[in-house]
Curated annotation (Swiss-Prot):
The keyword Transferase applies. It comes from the Bacteria. The gene is uppS1. This is Isoprenyl transferase 1. NCBIfam families: PRK14828.1 (NF011403), uppS (TIGR00055).
Length: 265
């Protein structure tokens, strides 16, 4: 009984202090350098569900899905112009069929929410959509196309995405384009460069991420934006994605503002 009372008081104190901490963080990032492009690795959904005591770990994916719309709104409120959200890797496609179907349904709901008029996002799907079931691919593409005239935050949705595969696809597309133009093999080799490959990435025409955030305590990129994140600042947090809060995001922005970006120099 004492433990319960102690926890309850602590919880009340935390809830009372939270708004003040959030306001303090907002003050600390006012007028300082902020990222234009933030990339998010939404990791830890299943672990969060297990540790929270849910028998059905898919509950973690559902709670995590609701967090994505919140995250996009946080970005809009802090003048982040572009967000890339990593939802499904090519490796994830090897999971059990029942779990995959559940993930496809959740991702479809997330994309539909982001495509809603209220959100006003401009969506871009990045990844191998041809690896997805036809109905899933159609649903995502229709949602993407419906946002063409929106004026809000740009949101890249990485689905069926693999960083190595993206680079391979970019090089192949470059070679195909040059071959179609009658370029010889020798001329083609001379035209392959960082800039020419960048123009054929899934994210072509967009700035590279300034800040990559990964939740759940894992400290690796796991194939996410391997080319684009070469000089990104990376911020890791032990917090699982479903438990990720606005103060966590603001802490990441504060940390970013304190770092000196050298771009390999």
């Amino acid at each position: 009984m004492r433990t319960l009372k102690k926890f309850s008081l602590r919880d009340l104190a935390y809830n009372a202090a939270y708004p003040f901490y959030e306001k303090r963080l907002m003050r600390e990032i006012q007028g300082v350098r902020q990222p234009e492009h933030v990339a998010i690795m939404c990791d830890g959904n299943r672990r969060w569900a297990r540790e929270a005591g849910f028998a059905d770990v898919t509950h973690g994916h559902r709670v995590g899905a609701k967090k994505i719309g919140e995250m996009v709104r946080w970005c809009a409120h802090t003048d982040v112009e572009l967000v890339t959200v990593y939802l499904l890797s090519t490796e994830n496609l090897g999971r059990a069929s029942d779990e995959l179907q559940m993930l496809f349904d959740i991702i479809g709901d997330v994309v539909d929410e982001l495509a809603s008029p209220e959100t006003n996002c401009r969506l871009r799907l990045v990844g191998h959509l041809d690896l997805l079931p036809d109905d899933v691919s159609r649903r995502l593409t229709q949602a993407q196309d419906s946002t063409n005239d929106n004026t809000g935050v740009f949101v890249n949705v990485a689905v069926g995405y693999g960083g190595r595969q993206e680079i391979v696809d970019a090089v192949r597309e470059l070679i195909d384009a040059e071959a179609a133009a009658g370029t010889t093999a020798t001329e083609m080799a001379e035209k392959i460069s960082v800039d020419s490959i960048s123009k054929h990435l899934y994210t072509s025409g967009q700035p590279d991420p300034d800040l990559v955030i990964r939740t759940s305590g894992e400290q690796r990129l796991s194939g996410f934006l391997l080319w684009q994140a070469a000089y990104s600042e990376i911020w890791f947090t032990d917090t699982y994605w479903p438990a990720f809060r606005r103060v966590d995001f603001l802490r990441a922005l504060r940390e970013y503002s304190k770092r000196s970006r050298r771009f390999g120099k």
